[in-house]
Amino acid sequence: MGVSKLDILYRRLLLTKLFIRGWGRPEDLKRLFEFRKMIGNRERCQNLVSSDYPVHIDKIEEQSDCKILDGHFVSPMAHYVPDIMPIESVIARFQFIVPKEWNSKYRPVCIHLAGTGDHHYWRRRTLMARPMIKEARMASLLLENPYYGCRKPKDQVRSSLKNVSDLFVMGGALVLESAALLHWLEREGYGPLGMTGISMGGHMASLAVSNWPKPMPLIPCLSWSTASGVFTTTDSFKMGQEFVKHFTSSADKLTNLNLVSRTLNLDISNQVVSQKPADCHNSSKTSVSATSEGLLLQDTSKMKRFNQTLSTNKSGYTSRNPQSYHLLSKEQSRNSLRKESLIFMKGVMDECTHVANFSVPVDPSLIIVVQAKEDAYIPRTGVRSLQEIWPGCEIRYLEGGHISAYLFKQGLFR
């Protein structure tokens, strides 16, 4: 099966954009790792948000075929992990698009979670919610992601999360905020209720439905079982998992975290050895930082070819120029450490985002997963299938890659 060149190009463009400040504060990571254990268990998580959690409507706008309600509420995340969210993200904001007429006595609602870069409501309202009003008389509730739109920190550039911990905060917050909105919709007499999302939004919707204590229709589009992208079983990957599970409470034992944080500040895009020794030496001073989904999907094949090239030419370098060989050996060691650090991060990300680490939805037969056949942005090779994790769910495939499907095939998602 081929892969989309557009996806590969987009993935490369994402590099150096996200997680520019590294992992985040060690004390924040410790609290988030502990909190993940709570929301990974539906029996515990369902009691975190009460059925009467307060939700407020700020404005109602009448249109020809629908009403648009704007509302807000305090993110439950702020209660359970205080001061972990930026002040701009504490207030959760949403838009509720309701048809003026229903097709039956039921009032169905679908909650749409935002994909990467989907700020505010325009895209989901225009491409999903308004057509669903016309086609099915179905209401849509659009929740704004933490770190996006009105909830974006002032010092954040566009969608570029500054820390790895920000992604974990976003995921935990969306799980609890979705629960608050589902409770509110039930109180208001709406139903049946369902959830969907595209790309990152689909993954977040999957985590939210996993924690809802009732059967819930779910349509995750262009997402898969984990945010880590490429599944690996190396020691560094396992170390990343164990790091989360047994994160120490002692600050003086965080050397591994600090080491990886420093290592991730190496330039992962500089994978070609300069012919000038001075350039080899100075390359260690370059700075990029690990990146979000782009980093998680970083192909390690180039690194392997790089190491193979060094190994093949070892004797030639040694005999002709011992000093150059010494510098290249240092570069090779640095690249090896860089590679291990990236794999370590994938282990941490997998432990925190893999749906297998969350409860199985109450009724997986209500889940339809939509995938692109040529998706090179979220590859499925080597990753546990959602059909294996959620027995009974249905997988549907559409032609094309991740980006082309996201841009041009949203009608199929509806």
Curated annotation (Swiss-Prot):
Matches recorded under Pfam families: ABHD18
InterPro entries linked: AB_hydrolase_fold (IPR029058), ABHD18 (IPR019149)
Localization in the cell: Secreted
Record's signal peptide: 1-24
GO cellular component, as recorded: extracellular region; mitochondrion
Glycosylation sites: 282, 307
Keywords: Glycoprotein, Secreted, Signal
KW Cell membrane (keyword) present: no
Gene3D superfamilies registered for this protein in UniProt: alpha/beta hydrolase
UniProt similarity note: Belongs to the AB hydrolase superfamily.
UniProt-recorded name of the protein: Protein ABHD18
Species the sequence originates in: Homo sapiens
Gene from which the chain derives: ABHD18
